[in-house]
Structure formats: structure tokens, C-alpha cells
Amino acid sequence: LMDDGPFDKNPHYVRLSTPKHAAKRTGLENEGFFGIGVKQGESYRFSVWARIPEGENSARIRVELVDTKSMGENHDFAVSQVVIDSKEWKRYQVIMKPTQTNPKATLRIFLEGTNAVDLEHVSLFPVDTWKGRENGLRKDLVQLLADLKPGIFRFPGGCIVEGTDLETRYQWKNSVGPVENRPLNENRWHYTFSNRYYPDYYQSYGLGFYEFFLLSEEIGAEPLPILSCGLACQFQNDDMSAHVAVEDLDPYIQDALDLIEFANGDVTTEWGKLRAEMGHPAPFNMKFIGIGNEQWGPEYPERLEPFIKAIRAAYPNIQIVGSSGPNSEGDQFDYLWPEMKRLKADLVDEHFYRPESWFLAQGARYDNYDRKGPKVFAGEYACHGRGKKWNHFNAALLEAAFMTTIERNADIVHMSSYAPLFAHVEGWQWRPDMIWFDNMTSFRTCSYYVQQLYSTYKGTNALKMTMDGKNITGADGQNGLFASA
């Protein structure tokens, strides 16, 4: 493994050289995430940055897609050779067409001949991606998103923004520019749970903020990026020394200002120019930005305040989303809401991962919210049935009831988003989730269909519905009746 590669943010590469023993071969193997799903006859683009470090003027590598469970004739079912013809770094690519469908293929690269080869940024992607984009997204997964007709798309997530520590927080500037020059980062969830340990689960940033903005545009949703406020995950970092001091927040605040410029700036600006170079000269017209995720305590508003001042001064039309903490009620929640009003946040993010009984009791939750303060963003929610960790109909029904509450109070609850959105059937952080997938297929849940119903058939006016002079809310002994019109 070498560390003087051609990309300053991603300098590591591997050198393959001939083994001394004639019966041995030098190579690399990548099994993907629970295998690599490929389909017979479809095209897959293999690419690699490579050079010859010494010796002759050409070298050759053999690229294989392999069924590791078979030692018969179909053991390798897609084979290509790539000739490396330069001592300077170049990108090489070849199209591979598997002769069989295999949900758990393995990619292998072998050195052929006696000349050493340096390899960097090895990639294998379907040619047939969403919108046909090179290194693009899986069509079936994005189509499910588009079919939801979403109004808002929050990215890159919640706790991943904070990081296990500040060093591993999500830094958007590392996720834009050429894909090969985006540095690897630890994934927030790869060892958090002892019963689900994925030591190779890292972020390559191949899906970065540019791709998120582009995806938002293509599915018709307003982008809502979330940035670090200088607090690492507070669940894992009790000591304030793990966080950025308020007086040292300037680089974090500048990141927020630069992101707005990247999304909306003219092509003559530094970050607007980069957006144009990546293929999108027109602005993305971003309207919202979130600062912090599930932060709590006085340390959060004292860090949020300078962000708000700076963003208001430079971009007064951008709406700022603050946080009400990780809980839907209690001391932290009750402390942060008045603070968000004091700071004049535009929206306050509330999160609800609660049991069925909680959702059943929320019919009147927003009836008495202050209409003069910040609006509500129900940024993460899902009904977690006790002892029923998978998606089930009763949970979806109660989520629908909660959405009726939101719809009836649309003057105060401006946005909502179910979470988590996607989960792989063999590697998930928790359950339930809206869309499940494996290496070949994807599956809608009952919660998905509820979200689709409400997003497709949006109301335009709320009519007051009463019984004996009281709003019909499902609360106050009304036996769980939820109504909206």
C-alpha cells in the first residue's frame, strides 16, 4: 500500500508486483456489500486509475466477476483484460457483460505478466443507472423515491452529520469535486452496535452533496442539507473537550456559507464555479439549511446563534432549521423550543421514534402550538411497535393517523419526513424502515404506501370538524378517531 498517489485528498493506492514463486498470482478481491449483484447480459463499467511504476512500457491486468461458490465452468462469468500503457496516471475502463445473473458476485483483479502495476480508485458500476449517469444510482431505488412525489429531501442524514467524533463528522466539501479525489471516512454506524459489527462499512463519498442536490432536483423535492454545528455525537461524548468551542466555530460557519454558495451561487463565485464544472451551471435554488441534528442542552443554542447571525447577514432568504433534541417531549425538548424561538429559527426539527400508544395519543399534538413562533419540521419519525420490529400494518395505520394530525395543522407543521428511508435486508442499523432492498430487488412497505397516499393526494384547505363543539382529534377519550378534511 502506497501513499504518494495523484489525488491530494485520497493519496493511497496499491502496487501489484510479481510474486517470487511461479505458482502464485498477485491480485485483489472485493466481495462488495453482501456480494455484488449483477444481471446476465447487462453492461457494467469497470474503471481504474493506473500506471506502470517501472520496467517495460506496458502491463496487463485481468478483471473477473466470480461466483465464489462454484468451482465449475461458470466460476468466472465475466472476464476482461486491461492493458496499462503509461508510466503516468491514467483512467482506464472496460465494459463487462456477465453470462449469468448472480446476486453475490465477487470482483477480482489479477496481475498478468512480470511488470508491476499501480492501481487507484477501482470502480464497478452498472451502465444502466438512474438517468444514465456514470457512477449513478440504482434505478429501482430512485424510482421508488420519485413515485413518492416528495416535497422535501433531507440529507445526508442525522447522526452521521455529527460523527462519532468531530474528525469523523460529515464534511460536505470532501464529498464534491472529482469522485476519485474524495477521501474515505468512517461510517457513523459501523461499530456502534455490538450485535451488528461491519468493520468494512465506510463512506467513499461517491454519493456526495452534488449528487444529493441533483437527486432532489430530479425527483422534484426541495433539498434540505444538514450540517455540523460543532458538536460531535453527544450520546458518545460527554466531555465538552470533544466539541468545538464557540469562539472557534468560524470554519464551521464558513462551511455553511460556502454550501449556500455552492448550491445557489453564480458561476463566477468559487463554489458556484465548482458546481458548474461538475455539470450544473444553473443554481439548485436551495431554500433551507439545517444546523445540527439531535443536539441538546445550552451548548447547542450557544453554537447555533452565530450560525444564524452569519447566514441571516449573507443570505436573508435562506430558512434555518434548528433542533428540539432527540426526544419528542421532556426536559431537553422543553428547554430547546423556547431557545429556538429566542433565536428566531425558521423551523424546529422534531423526531419521533415511538410506540403505537404514543402515536395513538398525538391527535391534538399541534392544536395549541404557538402560531407566531417557528414552524415545525417533523424531520424523523416512525411508529415502532413493541415487539414488532419489522414494518407492519398497524404501525402504518398509526403513522397515517399522525400524518392526519400534521395535515390538520399544516399552518404550523410545514414539513415532515419518514425515517430511515432505505435498509439492506442483510445490513441495517435498525428497524422499521420505509424501503427494503437486497442486491437485486427492492420492496415497498405498508409505511411506504401511507407516505405515497399523503404525498400524492395533498389537501389544499383544512375544514374544521367538531363534535359537541370540540375538534375531532382522536384525543380526550374519542377512542382513537382521527379525522381531517
Predicted ranges, named:
Residues 1-204, 222-224, 237-250, 257, ...:
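Extracellular and organelle-lumenal recognition/adhesion modules and their flexible linkers in secreted
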Residues 40-42, 461-485:
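Surface beta-strand/loop "capping" patches
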Residues 48, 149, 216, 259, ...:
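Conserved, mostly hydrophobic/aromatic
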Residues 110-112, 118-121, 126, 156-159, ...:
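Active-site groove signature of glycoside hydrolases
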Residues 112, 155-160, 228-230, 291-296, ...:
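Active-site beta-loop-alpha junctions enriched in small/polar residues
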Residues 151-156, 222-227, 287-291, 319-322, ...:
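Structural recognition of the beta-strand scaffold that forms the well-ordered cores
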Residues 214-215, 308-312, 316-319, 337-342, ...:
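Catalytic-core region of carbohydrate-active enzymes that cleave or remodel glycosidic bonds
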Residues 244-354, 363:
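Hydrophobic, small-residue-rich alpha-helical packing segments that form membrane-like cores
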